[in-house]
Amino acid sequence: MASPELSQFRRIVVKVGSALLVDSDKGEVRTSWLAALADDMAKLHKEGRDVLVVSSGSIALGRSRLKLPRGPLKLEESQAAAAVGQIALARIWSEVLGAHGIDAGQILVTLQDTEERRRYLNARSTIGKLLEWRAIPVINENDTVATTEIRYGDNDRLAARVATMASADLLVLLSDIDGLYDAPPKNNPNAKLIPVVDSISSEIEAVAGDAESELSRGGMRTKVEAAKIATTGGTHMLIASGKIEHPLQAIANGGRCTWFLTPANPITSRKRWIAGTLEPKGTLTIDAGAVTALRAGASLLPAGVIKVEGQFARGDAVIVRGPDTSEIGRGLIAYDADDAERIKGRSSPDVMTILGISGRAEMIHRDDLVVGG
C-alpha cells in the first residue's frame, strides 16, 4: 500500500520526546533544533492546518535546572522536578512559536483525562477553542501529579489518546529512529525499514524493540501500542526521525518513516470506537423529526428529545432511540441526566434561561454521535 503524503492531512499532532528536546550531555534544550521544528510547524499553520504538540521534557528540564545527579529519580523527586520543568517548558514553546506570531497554549493532562468522559469533553473543548483561535496547543503530561505514567512512561500512548480526542487525522511521533524495522537496526546491519503498516499484527508487535535512554522513557513497543490506539480511533500515525533539523519538512519531502494506517475513514473509525467501547449509562428517546435530522448528519438538539432515562453524567455514552423504541444510534451526552431532563423538548435559546448558564446547544454533537442504519 502506498504511503500517504503530509499535505493530505488537516489536523496534525506532533509528539516530541525528552531525548530530542533536551541535550543529554548539557541538560539544556536543543534550541537550534527546536527552532527548526517550529519553522516546520509555522509553515503548516500558515497553510491553514491545525497543529498540536504533545511535548515531553518537564522532568528532564527540571532535573537540569535543579542540578540533580544522573540516574533514576524517586517518584516524589520526579514530580518535584516536573514542577520546575513545566514552567521552563511552557516558556520555551511560547518563545519559539511566538517568533512566528503564533500563540502557544499549555494544557496539562494525564491518561485519566482522556478516559473519564467529562474530563475528556472539557479537554477537547479547550483544545478546540485554541485551534479556533489559531493558537497551537502544547500538551504535556502532568508529571507533578501523575504516578504510574511517571514510572513507566506513557507519553506515546498519551499522544495517541490526545490525537483521537482532538479528532486529528495524523499523529507524528518524532523519535531517535526513523521508523519500525523488521529487526533491531543497531544489532542487525541487514534490518529493513517497514514503510507502511496497514494492520498491527502479532508479527508487527513482535519486532517492536525497547530503544530506551535515561531521558526518554518510551521505546518502540510503546509506539506500536500508541499506533493501535491512534488507528482504532481514526488517526493515521507515523514514526520518523527527529534527530535531523526540519523533521516535518523531511517527511513532506518523502523522507524515511513508518506509516501506520487506519483501517477505514478516520471519522467512521473514530465513531466505531465510541460506539464499541463505551458502556451506555442512559437512553434518550427522540421524535421522528429528530430521527430524520440525525440520519442526515445533524447533531441532536434538546428540542427533539421526548424522553430521558438513566443516571448519567456529562460525557457518558447513551443510547438514542426513535419514537418506536428502535435504536437509532449511540453517542456522548453533553449534559448530565438532571439537566437533560430539564431541557428536553426545549429550543436552544431556552437552554440558557432554564439552566442559568450558557450551555452547549447540542444534546449530542454530531462528532460524538454514531447513527445506525
Curated annotation (Swiss-Prot):
This is Glutamate 5-kinase. It is found in: Cytoplasm. It comes from Bradyrhizobium diazoefficiens (strain JCM 10833 / BCRC 13528 / IAM 13628 / NBRC 14792 / USDA 110). GO terms for cellular component: cytosol. It comes from the Bacteria. Belongs to the glutamate 5-kinase family. The keyword Kinase applies. Keywords: Amino-acid biosynthesis, ATP-binding, Cytoplasm, Kinase, Nucleotide-binding, Proline biosynthesis, Transferase. Its EC number is 2.7.2.11. It holds the Pfam family PUA. Catalyzes the transfer of a phosphate group to glutamate to form L-glutamate 5-phosphate. It is an enzyme of class 2 (transferase). The gene is proB. One of its GO terms (molecular function) is ATP binding. It catalyses: L-glutamate + ATP = L-glutamyl 5-phosphate + ADP. Residues 281-358 form the PUA domain. InterPro entries: AceGlu_kinase-like_sf (IPR036393), Asp/Glu/Uridylate_kinase (IPR001048), G5K_ProB (IPR041739), Glu/AcGlu_kinase (IPR001057), Glu_5kinase (IPR011529), Glu_5kinase/COase_Synthase (IPR005715), Glutamate_5-kinase_CS (IPR019797), PUA (IPR002478). The keyword Ribonucleoprotein does not apply. ATP binds at K15, S175, D176. Substrate binds at S56, D143, N155. GO terms for biological process: L-proline biosynthetic process; proline biosynthetic process. Pathway: Amino-acid biosynthesis; L-proline biosynthesis; L-glutamate 5-semialdehyde from L-glutamate: step 1/2.
